[in-house]
Structure formats: C-alpha cells, structure tokens
Amino acid sequence: MSEHPDHAVNRLRSDAIARSTRPFLARGARVRRCPGCQVAEHACICAERPALDSGVSFCLLMHAYEPLKPTNTGRLIADCLPDTYAFTWARTEVDPVLLALLNDLRYQPYVVFPGEYAQPTQQVCEQIDAGQGRRPLLIILDATWTQARKMFRKSPYLADVPVLSLQTEQLSRYRLRRSTRDDHLCTVEVASACLQLAGDTAAAEALDGYFQRFTDAYLSTCRKRPQ
C-alpha cells in the first residue's frame, strides 16, 4: 500500500473531497482501500504501476464525480504517464489553465470523440499528426457516455479543436460498470488505442496490462457484480 501519487487526477480528487459537505459514497464505500490504487488494501497493486514514456500527452476533462469514483480509469493514465493533465469539466466557468493549454504552441490538441458528433466546421482526423514538431495533446472526456455527449456538445471552447475519431473494432473489456454498448471503450482503453495509433506500442501494451491488472484486483475483492 502506498500514498496516492501526486498527479492531476488525484489533485482533483483531493480538491473535491475538501469542498464536499458530505462523503461521496460510491459502491463498495465500506471497503478499506489503498489510497494509491483504490483497490482494497489487501489486494494493492501499487508495486505493479509502470512508469511510461510516450511521445503524446493526455488531457482529461472529467465529470465532477469521476475523480471520486474508485472505478475511474482516467486515474490509471495519470498513474503511468507523467505528462497527463486533468480538469473538472465546466460549460461556462472554464479553467484558464485549460484555455492556456489549448493555445500552447508546443502542443497539437485533438478531442478524442466519434467523428459523427463533430461540428460542421470542425476538422475530423483519423490519424495523429505531430505537425511542425508539436506534441500531440489528446483530450479525452472522462464521463459516462451520456455525460460525455453532453460535455462535447456544450463545450464551445473545443469547437475549433480537431476531432480524433478512432477507427477500432475493439470491444471494451471494462467490467467494473455496466454499459449498454460493448464498443464503448472506457477512458483508459481510449488512451491505449491512441497510443497504438501514435506508434507507441510498448506504452499502449503496458498501460493496457496495468488496466487489466487493476480490473482483476478490483473484481477479486467484490462480493457481487457491479450494478
């Protein structure tokens, strides 16, 4: 068991807990969890967390409740990849640090989302192009599918950002929450697919392996399937 790593997602979690007037009671709230990996203490996987290097960066726009959920997989990205940013999504009160990041000329931002939802004037890409030496910044909406569609639609500050539409036949292996669609990938699966697309195969496979290890450890401590 270890203290939680100091990264953007865990800082959002700490801030949300500090602001809350009552505890956030997720499923399994009675379980004594490792603060580092959010798995039950006796099944801690912190020692198995890989430190990865990649040619791309990630930016998670998170629904307000996501950092508080022990089943959140966006945290796994930040656990492994140090150049990961995270912000709580807001439609009107946008974090100025996020806006500065979107305009940072060191990065080429993309919103990772199905192309059919793009605005008519919005560029849709199926490949990652680090043009003019700019580092790809992949923005992932970390929420349920219903929430993510709303977030995408109601984020005018993303309207000029190219959409990266993943073309994958991969089915989700996420087993900690129920979904009506097997082709809806969870956040960390999207990140792994992006790493593959960028040619970072080793990082993609290591991140996917850590995700599978997290899922197996989490489920091994559950008394029943998630509802």
Regions of interest found by a model, annotated:
Residues L137, W145-Q227:
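C-terminal folded domains that constitute the principal catalytic or ligand-binding module
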Residues V39-H42, C46:
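Short Cys/His-rich local motifs and their 1-3 flanking residues in nucleic-acid-associated proteins
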Residues A47-R75:
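Short microdomains enriched in Cys/His and/or Lys/Arg
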Residues R30, A40, S54:
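Short metal-coordination and nucleic-acid-contact micro-motifs, chiefly zinc-binding Cys/His arrays
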